Amino acid sequence: CSGNTGAALARRNVGESVKQINTAFPHWFNNNYKKFNDKVDSLPVDQHMLIALIAPRPVYTTSATEDLWADPVGSYISISNAQQVYTLYGKKSGLTPEPPVPDTAIIHSILGYHNRTGIHDLTPYDWGKFILFAKYQYGLGRE
């Protein structure tokens, strides 16, 4: 799980805000980022653009159903919006227009995702999905 300034879109203004994360964790970001505390709509980039910079390499994001502070929907929109750049590289993702139901992972794709039932945490379920995704990306266990 990540949330604001992780996978979730900052300019969506849902859950944790740029101002809140800068206030709670002032050591995480440089002072320039704090200039956007009260004008998040002026940010020159948003998270989907940063995810797209990873193309054509694989990316896996995750959320948790009870972690509304981290905006699970915004995280899925973000990774979905990054698909456009992957397409430029000829990489087709297995993402669906709508987020998958909780506890359903998208593994066999260049862009992977799951929304686990529960709170903001990293659980054995999450680690298991990360490992399956990595194995798939490295050609281990492909069907």
Regions found by a protein language model. Name each.
Residues C1-L50, S75-T96:
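Mobile cap/lid helix-loop segments that gate and shape the active-site cleft of serine hydrolases
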Residues R11-R12, R57, R116, R142:
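Arginine residue identity/basic-tract feature
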Residues A24, S80, Y86-E143:
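C-terminal catalytic histidine-bearing segment of alpha/beta-hydrolase fold enzymes
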Residues L53-V59, I107-L111:
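Short, proline-enriched alpha-helix->beta-strand connector loops that line the catalytic pocket
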Residues A55-P72, R116-G118:
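Conserved strand-to-loop "acid loop" that flanks and positions the catalytic carboxylate
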Residues L68-S78, T123-D126:
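Conserved alpha/beta-hydrolase "acid-adjacent" motif
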